[in-house]
Amino acid sequence: MLALYHNDMSLCAQKARVCLAEKGLPWEDRHLVLRDGVHQQDWYKKLNRRAVVPTLIDGDKVIPESNVILEYLEDEYPEPRLSPKDSFGKAQMRLWTKQLDEDVHDASAAIISFGIAFRHQYLERGELGRAMLDQIPNLFKRERRRDVIEKGPDSMHFVIAVQRMVQLLDEMEEALAGHPWLVGDEYTLADVAFTPYLLRLEHLDLLGMVAERPRVADWYRRCQARPSFAEALRKWENEKYLTLMRERGGQHWPQVRAIMAGA
């Protein structure tokens, strides 16, 4: 049986769970509480040298990185199909998921989440929070996150993150003009990969960002209607995190809206 090291509210772990649900694949739950730092322990780093979730285990094979996991599952368990039949369609799908790896995840969605909500978890922990931050292997990622934890929405990284999210939503709105899904008439790994990012905006009470993008709003409603949404996302929602995100998101919506106006 497959096994997944994951976290309930991790965007990247959510992607993997959606894919597993769409494929109807059973898997062993190996949930990690990230705020306890278990993912930074040596035993886990042997599985995932970047000390992030998710990590998929398939027999004696270890597959890290969420987008790599999606493609592995598609190749290894091809039914039901979640990629276009033609090479050009597959290339378009990969261009979408490539954005997540390049900057949308770390430099936009994660920064918005930390700048609004998660920074308070680190600040409340004081020295322990700083020690956890120091454990992030990537220097640039660590210092960018440190800045946004210290300054919140006043960090320039936060401003850039919101602007990048606006750009992404505009690109999605344009792509959805000619067909119902991001890469044509069929639901693919591109839709799997981006669904958690709209859910994160919902959790942060920032769905106002899609108010003037009706095609994106409709796409998200259709993603929510799929059985995988309840199975892989709603079922795993952590009420403590939801309360923090919604309360803080509502407080900072005026700042986000102001950044959007100047984007």
Predicted features along the sequence, with ranges:
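A generic structural-conservation signal
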Residues: 29, 53, 185, 210, ...
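Long, positively charged, glycine-interspersed low-complexity recognition regions
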Residues: 212, 217-263
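GST-like fold's C-terminal all-alpha helical module
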Residues: 102-221, 225
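Short, solvent-exposed turn/loop segments enriched in Gly/Ser/Thr/Pro and often Arg
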Residues: 7, 33, 189, 236-237
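GST-like domain detector, emphasizing the conserved glutathione-binding G-site
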Residues: 1-139, 152, 250, 257-263
